[in-house]
Amino acid sequence: MMKALVIEDIKVITTAPEGINLVAVKVTTNDPSIYGVGCATFTQRYEVVVTAIDKYLKPFLIGKDPQRIEDIWRTASVSSYWRNGPVLNNALSGIDMALWDIKGKLANMPLYQLFGGKVRDAVPAYIHADAQSVSDAVELVQTRVDQGWKQIRVQIGGYGGNNQAMHLPKDNTPGVYYDPDVYMKTMIEGFEKLREKFGDSIKLCHDVHERLSPSEAVKFANQLEKFDLLFLEDALPPEQVQWFEHLRSHTNIPLAMGELFNNPHEWTGLIQNRTIDYLRLHLSQVGGITPTRKIISLADAYGVRTAWHGPGDMTGIGHAVNTHLSITSTNFGIQEWSCSIKENTYKVFPGTPVAKDGYIYLNDQPGIGVDIDEEAAAAFPTHDRMADWTLCRLPDGSAGRP
């Protein structure tokens, strides 16, 4: 009689192969040949996620059947009574992805086969062009085009145009300052120059990163309409999502939102009211694969497309999961590809998807198709530096949103 498969151990691995703190999870079973890996990165508070897994989820899960993914996700998510939030959801995500990885390995199928099979041959993606000036932006976009990219997100001067000179009080509080008026003016000038040079041969998008007030966001969106953007991202913060109906009624520019969402109430209304065009969830922030598959179905029913968040603060495992879901979703829109995915990422996370000429490609290995080289991970230790870009301020010294 075959021995029942159970979770034997859960290991949390922290690493920073490209200088950004990452958290990965490895779930092992009583069969030494069967294990799974997942992404649990909440980079700004990564050690809290480690504690949540080691102290709470690990003892809760050891001895359980790793194939009962739905039951494990549901019980683990409510076992602390209080639920959602970036710490618990990222911890859950690492476990959840690892269990799906195990499921795929047991079935000897890549995840995309378990999800119903491919509906496209590769995943179209956009890449960043983060420049310090308008002229630099034009040059960098040309570089991206020469690299084969057709869809490009353009930022000038950081989020909110941080590098711009501005009128400040005599004595100002330390922080990263930005001026919304200068920022909007600079971006309009930048898109004018980009359309002059490239015409409509490429698709462009932009991330406001919640740096504007609702009225400023409406004004900015109207000014951007003539540039035919793929979408305008995070024009408003999660705390102001009720303003999206007002924004939607005053502009025809496609709207994208979602990377900061943790709670179903944050996205459900936007989807059901068709207030956004693209849902930009960060999959580990909502709890992993299990909840995301349900969200995809909800969005599909209302004609909202996916555009998963794919930043540098995500393991190669997370990028692969994004791609498995994108390649199997009929309501897929586009996927983000990080410029931070470089040689060290592939050393630490062998099997990480590759991008070529604007498309992302998966391998055909069972499960997620990505592993963790623990020896390589240890060669890139994490650090405790605070991210200064989150400490942003308006010209008068008041705190802004990052």
UniProtKB/Swiss-Prot annotation:
Record-listed D-arabinonate binding positions: H209, E259, R280, H309, E336
InterPro entries to which the protein is assigned, alphabetical: DgoD-like (IPR034593), Enolase-like_C_sf (IPR036849), Enolase-like_N (IPR029017), Enolase_C-like (IPR029065), Mandel_Rmase/mucon_lact_enz_CS (IPR018110), Mandelate_racemase_C (IPR013342), Mandelate_racemase_N_dom (IPR013341)
Biological process according to GO: amino acid catabolic process
One Pfam match: MR_MLE_C
S-S pairs: none
Recorded GO MF terms: magnesium ion binding
UniProt function note: Has no detectable activity with D-mannonate and with a panel of 70 other acid sugars (in vitro), in spite of the conservation of the residues that are expected to be important for catalytic activity and cofactor binding. May have evolved a divergent function.
Protein family per UniProt: Belongs to the mandelate racemase/muconate lactonizing enzyme family. GalD subfamily.
Protein name as catalogued: D-galactonate dehydratase family member EGBG_02030
